[in-house]
């Protein structure tokens, strides 16, 4: 991990996002790019929120960059001297598109971002336009909900659908978990008692164990009539402080697992950060590893 991108919208949970990004940069010796993207038409719709700038491309961009620096120094304090930080601000009609472009431009290895409030965060998960950041980003996305508290992750839950891409996602997750010596809880919850096959689950566990050499890897296969209630319960019982998922292009992870009304009742989704891997990133990662192995031979 060399470059971490923090998309900062000055929301209420920016402090947590900054703290996490700083700690990760310290552990990986990564460079931190803090970017702010805004749509000038949206700002001008409420001119009382911004001062008058005759030169939008110059003065307003510099003002936003200065605001980024001041906020970062106030939160990071002494840690600000331990990492390399680059501050940039951009004007774009599509905030999500600009973020994706900058992740690619800076060759980002991780994107950290937050959501303003509970409602926006849940919409972020189950079908808003902003979800394109998760599904299209060429690196993992760390999402901080508004009600989250800052904790270095030591207990990570990987919500598995037993898909073929789960192994590659777990490889990526282990590289993060090792930094914090964190436990990984791989869980799969089924509502279908008839199709629930213990043999299939054991085969999945064996395959994962053979593929991934990490001593703090735990597997749980559970039956429940209510997936979201069981997930909430599991998070509380095991003091989970990071939830991981694989995002698919055809349908949101949470759209596939839950009905919309059920998601809005999940307490853990508004309190615990998410680490999201999408299929584009996992394919890219798999090819990169294959190329590296070929070069060794």
Please name every model-derived segment.
Residues 1-54, 155-220, 240-243, 269, ...:
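Small/aliphatic-rich secondary-structure junction motif
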Residues 53-67:
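A short acidic, glycine-rich active-site loop
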Residues 126-129, 200-204, 257-263:
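Charged helix-capping and loop-helix junction motifs
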Residues 73-111, 212-263, 272, 279-290, ...:
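Structural beta-alpha unit
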Residues 13, 119-120, 165, 251-253:
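Short glycine-rich, flexible loops that bind phosphorylated cofactors or substrates
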Residues 113-115, 140-146, 246, 274-278:
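Short beta-strand elements of ligand-binding domains
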Residues 109-125:
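Acidic (E/D-rich), amphipathic helical modules within compact regulatory domains
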């Amino acid at each position: 991990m060399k470059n971490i991108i923090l998309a900062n919208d000055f929301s209420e949970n920016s402090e947590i996002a900054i703290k996490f990004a700083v700690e990760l940069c310290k552990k990986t010796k990564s460079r931190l790019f803090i970017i702010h993207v805004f749509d000038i038409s949206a700002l001008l719709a409420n001119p009382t929120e911004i001062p008058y700038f005759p030169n939008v491309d110059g003065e307003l961009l510099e003002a936003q960059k200065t605001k980024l620096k001041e906020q970062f120094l106030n939160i990071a304090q002494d840690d600000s001297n331990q990492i390399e930080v680059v501050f940039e601000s951009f004007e774009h009609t599509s905030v999500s598109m600009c973020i994706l472009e900058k992740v690619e431009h800076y060759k980002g290895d991780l994107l950290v971002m937050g959501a303003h409030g509970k409602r926006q965060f849940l919409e972020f998960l189950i079908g808003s336009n902003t979800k394109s950041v998760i599904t299209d980003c060429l690196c993992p996305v760390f999402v901080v909900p508004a009600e989250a508290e800052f904790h270095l992750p030591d207990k990570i839950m990987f919500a598995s659908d037993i898909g073929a891409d789960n192994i590659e996602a777990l490889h990526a997750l282990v590289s993060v978990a090792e930094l914090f010596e964190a436990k990984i809880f791989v869980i799969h919850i089924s509502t279908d008692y008839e199709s629930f096959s213990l043999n299939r689950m054991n085969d999945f566990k064996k395959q994962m164990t053979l593929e991934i050499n990490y001593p703090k890897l735990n597997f749980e296969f559970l039956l429940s009539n209510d997936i979201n209630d069981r997930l909430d319960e599991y998070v509380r019982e095991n003091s989970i402080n990071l939830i991981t998922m694989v995002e698919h292009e055809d349908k949101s992870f949470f759209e596939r697992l839950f009905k919309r009304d059920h998601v809005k009742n999940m307490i853990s989704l508004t309190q615990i950060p998410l680490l999201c891997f999408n299929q584009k990133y996992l394919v890219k990662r798999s090819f990169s590893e294959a190329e590296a192995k070929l070069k060794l031979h």
